[in-house]
Amino acid sequence: MYREKIKVLDCTIRDGGLINNYHFTTDLVKAVYRAACDSGIDIIEIGKKLCESDEYTREKYGKWNFCDEDDIKQVVESHECENPPILAVMYDVDRVDVSSLLPSDQSVIGMVRTACYVPDIDKGLDLVKRSKDLGYQTTINIMASSAAIETELIEALEQVNNVAEVDYLYLVDSYGAFYSEQVTSYLNLYKEHAPNKELGFHAHNNQQLAFSNTQQAIIDGVNLLDTTINGIGRGAGNCNLELLLNFLKNPKFDVRPIYKAIQEHLVPLRKEIEWGFNDIYGISGHLNQHPRDAMKQRANAEIRDDCYDFLLEATS
């Protein structure tokens, strides 16, 4: 599937960090950045840009939850890149301090992505406006669309449509619940009520559909696609970057550096932390549930594979 307008965003560090509280080594982050550079990826999301506090410390939650300029510069300066990807960070509503964000012309960051649920759309759009005022490209990522009340989701989409500062509006399959026909249905809803916005798509792999649903989003006209190396991400993970690059057939992309990063860094990392499909996550996706209960069960060695019991409890 070749379409010149398609852009690929690698959120390996940001979504993968949800597994290990962003305690990635600097060497691994450098390797991911190097792979993104050498493969021609358009955007790399290097982590979150949250506000440190007594309860929310970098010692506990990892430095890539806070993305200080000096930490990012250390990564960027580790590898020369002729056409470097845009560097993105993510905001979570109610856990940010916009005053800590430099104007874009003084920062190595180029994009700020704001994640929020439908009830917090006003707060999310305020963060988008303030980010745009500082000169950044912006996205608004509406989480858990599959669990939102449709009338409330429509109202949120109409609000987004009227905010000029939003560059991209994301459909996010937070629970890995979508089938291809739902991807199309939701995207049609987004197009109807936010026709002024360029769309993005972020998939989760609970039902092993992240890649195919991303393909469906492409067919439906989405031009900004989220991926991670080897599918790393919270719970069942995300759409595999390497698979998407193979599918896109765009000569500007070179998938070989991605496979090199997998072999040298992601395969060893799998011995330390878990991601990817299993039947516990498959059940939570099918039931359109937040994966927290599935993740809790997977963390308990005695019951981690008790999918039948998990299903009974989840549906009781």
What is the predicted function of each stretch?
Residues 1-316:
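Catalytic cores and adjacent flexible loops of soluble metabolic enzymes
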